[in-house]
């Protein structure tokens, strides 16, 4: 059996792990041809395609940056316009408030002036009516006093100027004493 192993080893058989030299040369020629076609045809197309993609990506990035800058500029402009609109609205509100206060003040002044005018007119009318009533009352009091005096004396007294002057003086003294009394009451109340 040992002899058969030695015989088998002595016969040279081909090792499947080491290729034949003719196979190596043929494979090398095919590899070089494929490499040449790949180098001349496929690689430039792939490189061109990658360059186009890179340019497209860079262009999109540039467009995105430009759009972002435009958006930021528009945002700043919008913010400025919004701030300006708010300032204008504040001015308008303040102007309206000021105008409202002026209108209220004018209305108060007008109402106060009207009230003062009405009060003065009423006081003047009251004073005129008081004077009219006082003159009428003096005349009637004078007539009554003369009639009473005529009844006491038993003679008919005429309404002459002297009698009228006495009655007027008496009424004036009466008014003066009433004013003095009211002033004394006002002085003690304080």
Curated annotation (Swiss-Prot):
The keyword Phosphoprotein does not apply. The chain crosses the membrane at residues 24-44. One of its GO terms (molecular function) is proton-transporting ATP synthase activity, rotational mechanism. One of its GO terms (cellular component) is plasma membrane. Keywords: ATP synthesis, Cell membrane, CF(0), Hydrogen ion transport, Ion transport, Membrane, Transmembrane, Transmembrane helix, Transport. Its main location: membrane. It is a single-pass membrane protein. Belongs to the ATPase B chain family. NCBIfam families: ATP_synt_b, PRK05759.1-3. F(1)F(0) ATP synthase produces ATP from ADP in the presence of a proton or sodium gradient. F-type ATPases consist of two structural domains, F(1) containing the extramembraneous catalytic core and F(0) containing the membrane proton channel, linked together by a central stalk and a peripheral stalk. During catalysis, ATP synthesis in the catalytic domain of F(1) is coupled via a rotary mechanism of the central stalk subunits to proton translocation. Component of the F(0) channel, it forms part of the peripheral stalk, linking F(1) to F(0). This is ATP synthase subunit b. The lineage of its organism: Bacteria, Bacillati, Actinomycetota, Actinomycetes, Micrococcales. The gene is atpF.
């Amino acid at each position: 059996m040992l002899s058969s192993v030695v015989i088998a080893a002595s016969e040279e058989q081909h090792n499947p792990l080491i290729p034949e030299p003719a196979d190596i040369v043929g494979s090398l020629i095919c590899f070089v041809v494929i490499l040449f076609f790949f180098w001349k045809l496929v690689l430039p197309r792939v490189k061109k395609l990658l360059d186009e993609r890179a340019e497209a990506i860079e262009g999109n990035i540039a467009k995105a940056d430009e759009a972002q800058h435009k958006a930021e500029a528009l945002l700043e402009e919008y913010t400025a316009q919004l701030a300006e609109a708010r300032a204008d609205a504040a001015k308008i509100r303040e102007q309206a408030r000021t105008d409202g206060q002026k209108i209220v003040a004018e209305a108060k002044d007008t109402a106060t002036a009207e009230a003062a005018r009405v009060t003065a007119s009423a006081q003047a009318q009251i004073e005129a009516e008081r004077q009219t009533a006082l003159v009428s009352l003096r005349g009637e009091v004078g007539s009554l006093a003369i009639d009473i005096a005529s009844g006491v004396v038993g003679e008919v007294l005429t309404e002459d100027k002297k009698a009228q002057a006495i009655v007027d003086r008496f009424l004036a003294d009466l008014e003066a004493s009433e004013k003095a009394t009211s002033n004394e009451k006002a002085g003690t109340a304080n």
